Amino acid sequence: WESTGIKTLHDLKGKKVYVGPGGGGAGTDIEEIIELVTGMKPGDYESFKAPWGEGMGMMRNGQVDAMVRIAPVGAAVIQEFGLSKPIRFLQIEGDDLTKLDLYLKVPGRSISQIPAGTYEGQTNGDAVNTLSFVAGMGIHAGISDDVAYTLTKAFWDNIDEIKASASLAFGL
């Protein structure tokens, strides 16, 4: 929230931060990013891991000071926060971007931007640098061509329903 005064990852020291679900890669990646940029590890800030929906509830209810959420730019799951009170996205710039060089060498990781005014209630006056990731799907190489075709056809025949229920499919 804008009211927390948190503007960069450096401001997370001593704060309660929701980083994603336990047991998944998101929370681990987020903790790694915070450490690369700031040198802080969990303990320097209070790291919370829970399912995405629960984490969003923690943010809504003020149980955490900051939240990191994987979602495409413009996603409704983020917009809902801006509809209730002013929100700020944490900027990563200058030397902090350079600290992520090694992290960004992994294929599928890059820097992207959230333009100013993307979300109702967004207080950032300028575009905000953010991390972006490529997501993909695959199947076992031993699956028959017929089954692979059936799965692919079912996916694309139902793409509108998939987009409506899964924010990560937003850009498909």
Region roles according to the model:
Residues 2-61, 160:
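Bilobed "Venus flytrap"/periplasmic-binding protein-like clamshell domains
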Residues 16-22, 134-142, 172:
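Second-shell loop/turn segments in exported
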Residues 53-67, 79-85:
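Short helices/loops that flank or line small-molecule/ion binding pockets
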